[in-house]
Amino acid sequence: MIIDRAGRACFNRRPMATIGCVYLVGAGPGDPGLLTRRGADLIGCADVLAYDALCNPSLLKLAPESAEIIYAGKRAADHAIPQGELNQLLVQKACEGKTVVRLKGGDPFVFGRGGEEAEELAEAGVPFEIVPGISSSVAAPAYAGIPVTHRDHCSSYTVITGHERPEKGNESSINWKQLAESDGTKVILMGVERIRGIAERLMENGLDVETPVGMVRWGTTCRQETLTGTLETIADLVEQKGFKAPAVTIVGGVVDLREQLSWFERRPLFGRRVVVTRTRTQASVLGARLSELGADVLEIPTIKIAEPEDQEALRDGLLGLGSYQWLVFTSPNGVDCFFNYFFKGFDDLRDLGGCRIAAVGPATAAKLKALHLKIDLMPDCYTAEGVAAAFRDSEEYSIENENVALFRAQVASPELPRELESLGAIVDDIPVYQTVSETEDRNGAVARLEEGGADWITFTSSSTAEHFDARFGLVATLEKHGARVLSIGPETTKALKKLGVEPAVEAQPHSIDGMVEALMAAAG
């Protein structure tokens, strides 16, 4: 058994001297939360990950950093890699002894050409496994509030493709008469471009022209759009609205239930696109909160955490821990980095000495509490002035003539140590990390920003703003896309103003919760 970098057990890796294995994994319909646990575990162990156009790009971050990522997208006649070449590539990578994950939208065996790929692997003697995924044929209707079966309406449903093999010409393997006469719901995949012909065939074969029709575009994602009409009107509506693929079409009386059962598109941030610029490991925290509320989240980390350039102060601080009366942590990164160094030299938390601990913000406090450390002081306002005020107003604690260790970023505002010194403290400002530029875009979020813009760009620190500006040009990005800026607090706002940007909103309180509340309020 091998444990991957996320701590997951990878039972299926094989020694590199032997042939590898190919996993045909269903990525689900688009919502990353609908990926199966088995699928997530396999992505986390992949040496090679080949993914389709309809796979949510955010799933790529589950792969090891060392994994080879191959885009194998197919849209109509535009294939990044022709199917035959892709089949051979899967065989080749497996024969190199690699663990290969072929990530396919929906389910591999539901109009996903997974059968063809599995046949090729079987003929080549390459071990393979099929990992089913949730098909858009049921998931997209569900997210639109349309049940494909309902005791009061129908007890069956039929799924067909609206895009048969081109070489069939006008020939069709679909029995349209039987389909039209059946009482069940009709679900059509890949049928947007041919919706007029599909509707005409159903009507020609006796299906009532007033039969309700629903079309769900980008189902289960925050880009979801739903169009409803009847067999007689749907094709004209598609043309009028410019409704494009990918979409699932549902034909039947159950479509009328959408008016009562719609839920996904009613979430408070639905339809808003929000850019999150935190570090790659932290972006998911804010991103997940926003996604749950319906936002289309683009995770574009602009910084990553690295060791401080000069570690002498850190070494001295660790060796002199027993001399401090207070340890002050201003961010979750500060906690993580400090204790990473601490546990390299000490085995026992009691080696911190008899100090008290101050934490700035609930996220910082949560990191410390996870280590079973008591927070002695946490200011109501998460700023330098707030920390100083908390000490100044405290009836229990005085820091006059006390030694205070301040563990934070290498580049940080001098205001906090100055405020603490004004209260008589002897302050050691100890850098435990630095922020450096992050330029990698594994999930395609930068391209999506360029193509479709954003409603909001969020900044959680001065460094995220400065590095975003250095990489993209903040003012130019805002002017191009008409986006608004959300700042977590005063220090970040100061940095933004220096860059020529006035935030539309500053979070109150200055925390992730405050940022979420601010976006909710702005959405109305």
Regions found by a protein language model. Give the residues of each.
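Class I S-adenosyl-L-methionine
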Residues: 2-4, 10-32, 37-134, 139, ...
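Class I SAM-dependent methyltransferase SAM-binding "motif I" and its flanking Rossmann-like core
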Residues: 107-182, 227, 377-383, 443
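Conserved anion/nucleotide-ligand pocket segment
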Residues: 167-214
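Short, well-ordered beta-strand core segments
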Residues: 47-49, 69, 147, 186, ...
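Signature of uroporphyrinogen-III synthase
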Residues: 16, 30, 76, 82-86, ...
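Conserved active-site and cofactor/substrate-binding residues in soluble primary-metabolism enzymes
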Residues: 34, 38, 44, 54, ...
